[in-house]
Amino acid sequence: MINFNQAAENNKKPILTELKRILVEPGALLEIGSGSGQHVLYMAELLQDVIWQPTEMAVNLSALAHNLTSSRIHNILQPFELEVGKDWPNGEYRYAYAANVLHIMSEKLLPSIFKELKEVVQAGGIAVFYGPFKYNGYFTTDSNKRFDEWLRKKSSEAGIRDIEMVLAEAHNSGFTLIEDIAMPANNQLLVFSRQ
């Protein structure tokens, strides 16, 4: 597998446990930033009523497509290029899912991701974000603080986001937080409903 990611391997089971409970209706799901495809390959097989649309930035798209080629899982569509802050292809999805995306992309793009989701997630649909967050300006653990420092050394645009800022941008685009679930390794699963 090209671009294998150990963190994705470690978190796929606990995330799936929650998604089985959240994604109860059949429908299409837009995965933002599919990375190596480890999540879609694992989860689509076990959530057969959900049609998965993997996406990735242009620079990573060929690796994702390569990893998905050998898959015979019927509910995974061909991946396409998607970048927050640029035009998204038309589509209508019941669900959207992004794991470890918000702390990698620029904070300036937070308004864009929710505005773009509003255009593609149907009313009453669900958007799910997995990753670490700060609460009231504070890291939840020392390890998250160290992780944030490491991220910012790699890119000045990256960093763990304040939950309050995420919630405000979500609200501005018609998304309401319905669950904030504590996950292993100091991460959260944020579940939003689109009005």
Task: Map each language-model feature to its residues.
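Class I SAM-dependent methyltransferase SAM/SAH-binding core
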Residues: 30, 38-86
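A short, conserved alpha-helix within the catalytic core of class I
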Residues: 105-117
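Conserved beta-strand signature within the Rossmann-like core of class I S-adenosyl-L-methionine
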Residues: 124-133
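Short alpha-helix
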Residues: 157-174
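Core SAM-dependent methyltransferase catalytic element
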Residues: 175-195
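Conserved glycine-rich SAM-binding loop
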Residues: 35
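Class I SAM-dependent methyltransferase Rossmann-like catalytic core
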Residues: 1-25
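A short acidic, Gly/Pro-enriched loop at the edge of an enzyme's catalytic core
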Residues: 88-96
